[in-house]
Amino acid sequence: FSTATDLAQLFQMLLNGGRYNGQQIFRPATVATFTNKSRFNYRALGFDRLKGGWPNVVKAGASEETFGHTGFSGTCVWADPENELVFVLLTNRIHPNPKNNRLKRFNTRGRAHLQVYRSLLRPEA
């Protein structure tokens, strides 16, 4: 578990080719290895890629280079290199119990993505 700020900094570092606050944390080649789409499926070595069927993220306007992670407990973090955008949404999906499906039922992640892209990248949409 972490904070939205920590995750935003981590994903911004990945967008910067492994560099953050003037310090090289990972080599650009390492970042590429973890974020480039696999030949075998929609995942990269470290993250999901859009081609894997994240229609809400794609529909929102994310580029095909977008990578990220959605987690069981409600974590949702995406980085869109083409649009220079980091998206972090932290929720407590498993409250009050692990069978809670309100995030999916209300399409919370997809609706949040859509609003971010509409307001920041496509204000006319």
For the regions a protein language model found, what residue spans apply to each?
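Catalytic loop of the DD-peptidase/beta-lactamase superfamily, centered on the K-T-G motif
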Residues: 1-125
